[in-house]
UniProtKB/Swiss-Prot annotation:
It comes from Chlamydia caviae (strain ATCC VR-813 / DSM 19441 / 03DC25 / GPIC) (Chlamydophila caviae). Endonuclease IV plays a role in DNA repair. It cleaves phosphodiester bonds at apurinic or apyrimidinic (AP) sites, generating a 3'-hydroxyl group and a 5'-terminal sugar phosphate. Keywords: DNA damage, DNA repair, Endonuclease, Hydrolase, Metal-binding, Nuclease, Zinc. This is Probable endonuclease 4. GO terms for biological process: base-excision repair.
Length: 289
């Protein structure tokens, strides 16, 4: 189930700050030369969300019109675990997922990105089935076909997290794509940490073919661009500035120029803040000239 087409121009951005209001994330994106952004719609480390007001919504939509940024992504909170074996955590997670989706629809956001979940003391198979049940409950929210896609982010495979391999993500998508719009956000640091070699054009082509065979490239809707502080397959989620980690700059140059990936929206999560992101956006844009 797809609700809107891919962008017609390459989109680059970063995870910007909502300090002072959600609309400020949009304006910060404009300041760093971004054409899209990722943001939190609520405090990512709290269960309780502040309700959206008409004023907040209008300010956000005004910022979108003034800046022409598009394909905005919301990153869901870190406490959410839709595969939790703990009934209390599971119920809180499902409430947060519902609220997150509702807020994204109200704001006109196109992507909402979730970490799939963690098995904790259960099996990964049971965790995956529980995640499917959690997101199946969201089907009524999509009855009017809002232009919003739920994205599952690739994980580094640390601890009991699921989603570190394409097979697990495929299982989620195959069981949900007839109920809600779903896709995948590849985090470059995470898949590298999980054991996918993406250090060269040749290795990237193998990974993308694997993705296409297992999931289908039409479900690849976004990238988180991060280098890695640790070598391949260490299952450690530690981001580094582009070209300053073990992945290397050629990997990101490939994503900007390869026909299958150049038009997919890309969001920086590199450590360093707005000044670094502005520099990295200019560098990435230069690869396409």
């Amino acid at each position: 189930m797809q609700v809107f087409p891919p962008p017609q121009v390459p989109l680059l951005g970063a995870h910007t700050s909502t300090a002072g209001g959600l609309h400020n994330a949009i304006y910060e994106g404009q300041e760093i030369g971004a054409s899209t952004i990722q943001m939190f719609t609520a405090n990512q480390r709290q269960w309780r969300r502040r309700p959206l007001t008409d004023s907040l919504i209008n300010s956000f939509k005004t910022a979108l019109k003034e800046t022409s940024l598009s394909y905005i992504m919301s990153h869901a909170g870190y406490l959410i675990n839709p595969g939790s074996p703990n009934p209390e955590i599971l119920e809180k997670s499902r409430i947060c997922i519902q609220q997150e989706i509702q807020d994204c629809i109200s704001l006109g956001i196109n992507f909402v990105n979730f970490h799939p979940g963690a098995a904790v003391n259960d099996t990964k198979e049971t965790c995956l089935d529980r995640i499917i049940s959690s997101f199946s409950l969201m089907e009524p929210l999509f009855e009017n076909s809002p232009p919003l896609v739920v994205l599952f982010e690739t994980t580094a495979g640390q601890g009991t997290l699921v989603g570190s391999n394409f097979e697990e993500l495929s299982y989620l998508i195959d069981n949900l794509n007839h109920k809600i719009p779903v896709g995948v956000c590849i985090d470059t640091c995470h898949i590298f940490a999980a054991g996918y070699d993406i250090t060269s054009p040749e290795s990237w082509k193998r990974v993308l073919k694997n993705f296409d065979d297992v999931i289908g490239l039409s479900y690849l809707r976004a990238f988180h661009l991060n280098d890695s502080m640790f070598p391949l397959g260490q299952h450690k989620d530690r981001h580094a500035p582009l070209g300053e980690g073990d992945i290397g700059i050629e990997s990101f140059k490939f994503l900007m120029t390869n026909e299958d990936t150049r038009m997919i929206p890309k969001y920086l999560e590199t450590p360093g803040g707005p000044d670094l992101w502005a520099k990295e956006i200019r560098q990435l844009q230069s690869f396409q000239k």
